[in-house]
Swiss-Prot record:
Cofactor(s), names only, from the UniProt record: Zn(2+)
A biological process from GO: tRNA wobble guanine modification
Cofactor: how and how many bound: Binds 1 zinc ion per subunit.
Protein name: Queuine tRNA-ribosyltransferase
Organism this protein belongs to: Methylibium petroleiphilum (strain ATCC BAA-1232 / LMG 22953 / PM1)
Length: 375
């Protein structure tokens, strides 16, 4: 089940409401990433309390561990990880792509050695649909080949990008057929590919729209390309997708990227950045980024962000968090992860409120000014 209601627009920016089998998602929204069935260091109840409406799981990693027998026993991912709101699962295409020389791509699928135990595995569009059906994720992603920015040490050529994009389209058709055969009650999204070549992006988009997916994603960005190239594709693709269906920008990105994505018509975002950066002392605030490992914070009594209402900013000083990081105490990355996720989720809440009020452009200008001010 998927229903998308477009509530308001301002330029290309959209305010929407997405209804899925496990609940309603107000868009635009940021989706925390729970690769192995957990958003690292954060309890599900804490995620919900800070405003998370939908989270991610990873098909590839969950297939390897704990495996389908365990997930089938629990009736899917929701009960297994104690999260009763919507879940989106990636198809495994990006993870297979990231294996590099360890994998071999053919028309049929991808052969690779398991990074867990070295077993020889074969992942196909059909297998991906079967795994995601067991996971019972509300949004299922098609199995695709992530077109790299560089191929074998050189920039990916248009010919190489075309071959990759056309393979993903053939896989999309196979995913749609298998998804229907399985009678999966959830929603399958197609993924626009085409590298950094706008005509290929348009060709991919047109072919996927003709297949009539319930929603669409923009893939193959934030894969090593310069920021201006990513922004060019972000400006080209989202608003050309059907207005009455949700749009998802995969794996992006910084707070600035999210606001720019909303400007270009994106509804859904995900990225590991809030939690990964938190574990490395890189924190996001209203007034720019804070590098917690800097010695200047050793005696700083202020919270991470004085305007923030998260648990980490309610009674914990920068000095204390700096101390936890220096000592390798597990409470440190737990608190900083909560802060960064709260910041991203709150940013998107403010975006929605600005769109509701018809003042998104004014919000965007103030956001840029605040972030440029510095901590």
């Amino acid at each position: 089940m998927l229903r998308f209601d477009l509530l308001h627009t301002e330029g290309h920016a959209r305010r929407g409401r997405l209804t899925l089998n496990h609940g309603v998602v107000e868009t635009p929204i940021f989706m925390p990433v729970g690769t192995y069935g957990t958003v690292k260091g954060v309890m599900p109840a804490s995620l919900e309390a800070m405003g998370a409406q939908i989270i991610l799981g990873n098909t590839f990693h969950l297939w390897l561990r704990p495996g389908l027998d365990v997930l089938r026993q629990f009736g899917g991912l929701h009960r297994f990880e104690n999260w009763q709101r919507p879940i989106l699962t990636d198809s495994g295409g990006f993870q297979v792509w990231s294996l590099g020389a360890m994998r071999k791509i053919s028309e049929e699928g991808v052969k690779f050695a398991s990074p867990v135990n070295g077993d020889k595995l074969f992942l196909t569009p059909e297998t991906s649909m079967q795994i995601q059906t067991v996971l019972n994720s509300d949004i299922v992603m098609q199995f695709d080949e992530c077109t790299p920015y560089e191929t074998s040490g050189h920039l990916t050529t248009e010919q190489e990008a075309r071959a990759s994009m056309e393979l993903s389209l053939r896989w999309a058709a196979r995913c749609k057929t298998e998804f229907a055969r399985l009678e999966n009650p959830n929603a399958l999204f197609g993924i626009v590919q085409g590298g950094m070549f706008e005509p290929l992006r348009q060709a991919s988009l047109d072919a996927l729209v003709a297949m009539d997916f319930p929603g669409y994603a923009i893939g193959g960005v934030s894969v090593g390309e310069p920021k201006d190239e990513m922004l060019r594709i972000m400006a080209h693709t989202p608003h050309r997708l059907p207005a009455h269906k949700p749009r998802y920008l995969m794996g992006v990105g910084t707070p600035e990227d999210l606001v720019e994505g909303v400007t270009q018509g994106v509804d859904l975002f995900d990225c590991v950045m809030p939690t990964r950066n938190a574990r490395n002392g890189h924190l996001f605030t209203r007034h720019g980024d804070l590098r917690l490992r800097n010695a200047r914070y050793k005696t700083d009594e202020r919270p991470i962000d004085e305007s923030c209402t998260c648990t980490a900013c309610n009674g914990f000083s920068r000095a204390y968090l700096h101390h936890l990081d220096r000592c390798g105490e597990m409470l440190g990355p737990m608190l900083t992860s909560i802060h960064n996720l709260h910041y991203f989720l709150n940013l998107m809440r403010e975006v929605r409120e600005a769109l509701d009020a018809g003042r998104f452009e004014a919000f965007r200008a103030q956001f840029r000014a605040d972030r440029a001010r510095g901590v």
